[in-house]
């Protein structure tokens, strides 16, 4: 009996193990299955076999135990409520004409008739086109380009006819450096200048739905390989880079020439060739030998005989000369009229209007000295008081005039007398006009005079 009981126990245990592996799990095993991640993804392909559409789903986690798991679609179907998927290794698919393609369908993962997870999906938004085929590359020697052509089965379909294609090409040695070109047609032109010469290239293409239908990229088409030829420039052709540099250089030189012609006289010539003074004067200054023993002295004592005053303006000199030339004749005429009219003054007394003050005479003499008039500097400077007025004119007035004339005549007989004594009246000599000399009557007849001879001796 003991042996028989042990045998039945072993058989029962084996049946439990076999039933668990075959899918007849108990309640505890079902709870463990519910804890797994059964997320999945699906895509649809329209008109894959005539008018039939296909729907393919797969779990996102490849390690999921798919034993006893099944897919079911419900809603947006024609004539039926739900359809079950068929399993092919790790994927689940269904191929039928009963997809309505309007609205959303409910796709669920079930185990033992119980739904584990569900998704609502619109089949028109998960369309995956078929991969392009017949990819080829043709080189056109005359145009120096490559024409890429391919074909797709969607050109003859009713639903998904508008596609966007992605053409990818790379140099064979650059494994991860793909260059992509997107286009809606099935023809592409690659320029030879954009490719490396004598290089092997790999090219492939894929498609994605556009406009109404949305979805995923198709699988890549089989790769196509082509080689670029060597660049042989014909004798008449020129490198584009060299041509560009030549044109830029030509325009730059032309611009510089135009600017030089326009700005030559105003800007460039004064800097490059500055204007020089008259060549005759320049050569005279350069070639003329300096004179020797020049009578040039910077000794301050040489300038003691001639007082130097500052002249701030040329107008001051003109005013003084005009004053001396215009004022004195008028005053002399008035003096004559007064004398002839029998005024109170003595006949031998000169009018006060004729008398020149020492300050004005000094100023005029200094101006003439500055102008280089030696005769003006040599003129005697007379200073006296007017204490001897007209009351003493009858006694020593004529005598003073005669002494003055005698002293001037004895010191420098060559100079014309600046005054003429007519009837005891002192007047200006017309010859000496422009060189007025101050005369005044003074009580002291022993005044010092500076004559031309003493001036030359000092020099």
UniProtKB/Swiss-Prot annotation:
The Fibronectin type-III domain is annotated at: 131-231
Question: What is one cellular component GO term in this UniProt entry?
Answer: external side of plasma membrane
What organism does this protein naturally occur in? Answer: Macaca fascicularis (Crab-eating macaque)
Write out the transmembrane intervals. Answer: 241-261
The answer to whether UniProt assigns keyword Cell membrane to this entry is: yes
Residues in the signal sequence: 1-20
Q: Which family does it belong to?
A: Belongs to the type I cytokine receptor family. Type 4 subfamily.
Q: Which residue stretches are annotated as topological domain Extracellular?
A: 21-240
UniProt keyword list = Cell membrane, Disulfide bond, Glycoprotein, Membrane, Phosphoprotein, Receptor, Signal, Transmembrane, Transmembrane helix, Ubl conjugation
Where in the chain are disulfide-linked cysteines found?
Answer: 42-57, 74-82, 108-118
Domains (record comment): The WSXWS motif appears to be necessary for proper protein folding and thereby efficient intracellular transport and cell-surface receptor binding.
**Membrane topology field:** Single-pass type I membrane protein
Q: Which GO terms describe its biological process?
A: hemopoiesis; positive regulation of receptor signaling pathway via JAK-STAT
Upper classification of the source organism reads: Eukaryota, Metazoa, Chordata, Craniata, Vertebrata
Q: So which stretches are on the Cytoplasmic side?
A: 262-459
Motif WSXWS motif: where?
217-221
Q: Where is this motif: Box 1 motif?
A: 272-280
Protein's name according to its UniProt entry: Interleukin-7 receptor subunit alpha
Gene name as annotated: IL7R
**InterPro entries annotated for this entry?**
FN3_7, FN3_dom, FN3_sf, Hempt_rcpt_S_F1_CS, Ig-like_fold
Function summary: Receptor for interleukin-7. Also acts as a receptor for thymic stromal lymphopoietin (TSLP).
Q: How does it assemble?
A: The IL7 receptor is a heterodimer of IL7R and IL2RG. The TSLP receptor is a heterodimer of CRLF2 and IL7R. Interacts with CD53.
């Amino acid at each position: 009996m003991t042996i028989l009981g042990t045998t039945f126990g072993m058989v029962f245990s084996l049946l439990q193990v076999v039933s668990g592996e075959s899918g007849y799990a108990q309640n505890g095993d079902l709870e463990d299955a519910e804890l797994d991640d059964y997320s999945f993804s699906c895509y649809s392909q329209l008109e894959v076999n005539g008018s039939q559409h296909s729907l393919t789903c797969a779990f996102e986690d490849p390690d999921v135990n798919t034993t006893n798991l099944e897919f079911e679609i419900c809603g947006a179907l024609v004539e039926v409520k739900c359809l079950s998927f068929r399993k092919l290794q790790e994927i689940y698919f269904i191929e039928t004409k009963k997809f309505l393609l309007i609205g959303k369908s409910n796709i669920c993962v079930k185990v033992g008739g119980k739904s584990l997870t569900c998704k609502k999906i619109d089949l028109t938004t998960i369309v995956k086109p078929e991969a392009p085929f017949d990819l080829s590359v043709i080189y056109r020697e005359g145009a120096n380009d490559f024409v890429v052509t391919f074909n797709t089965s969607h050109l003859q379909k009713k639903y998904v006819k508008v596609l966007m294609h992605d053409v990818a090409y790379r140099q064979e040695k650059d494994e991860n450096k793909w260059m992509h070109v997107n286009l809606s047609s099935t023809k592409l032109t690659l320029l030879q200048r954009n490719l490396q010469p004598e290089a092997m290239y790999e090219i492939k293409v894929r498609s994605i739905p556009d406009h109404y239908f949305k979805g995923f990229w198709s699988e890549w088409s089989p790769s196509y390989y082509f080689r670029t030829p060597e660049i042989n420039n014909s004798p008449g052709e020129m490198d584009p880079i060299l041509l560009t540099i030549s044109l830029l250089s030509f325009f730059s030189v032309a611009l510089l020439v135009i600017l030089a012609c326009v700005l030559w006289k105003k800007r460039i010539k004064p800097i490059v060739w500055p204007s020089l003074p008259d060549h005759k004067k320049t050569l005279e200054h350069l070639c003329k030998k300096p004179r020797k023993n020049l009578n040039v002295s910077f000794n301050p004592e040489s300038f003691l005989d001639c007082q130097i005053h500052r002249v701030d303006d040329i107008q001051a000199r003109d005013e003084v000369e005009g004053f001396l030339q215009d004022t004195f004749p008028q005053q002399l005429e008035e003096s004559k009229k007064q004398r002839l009219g029998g005024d109170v003054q003595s006949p031998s007394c000169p009018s006060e209007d004729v008398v020149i003050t020492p300050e004005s005479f000094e100023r005029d003499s200094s101006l003439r000295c500055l102008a280089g008039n030696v005769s003006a500097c040599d003129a005697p400077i007379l200073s006296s008081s007017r204490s001897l007025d007209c009351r003493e004119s009858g006694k020593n007035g004529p005598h003073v005039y005669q002494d003055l004339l005698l002293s001037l005549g004895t010191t420098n007989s060559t100079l014309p007398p600046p005054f003429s004594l007519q009837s005891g009246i002192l007047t200006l000599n017309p010859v000496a006009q422009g060189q007025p000399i101050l005369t005044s009557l003074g009580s002291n007849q022993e005044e010092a005079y500076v004559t031309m001879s003493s001036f030359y001796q000092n020099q």
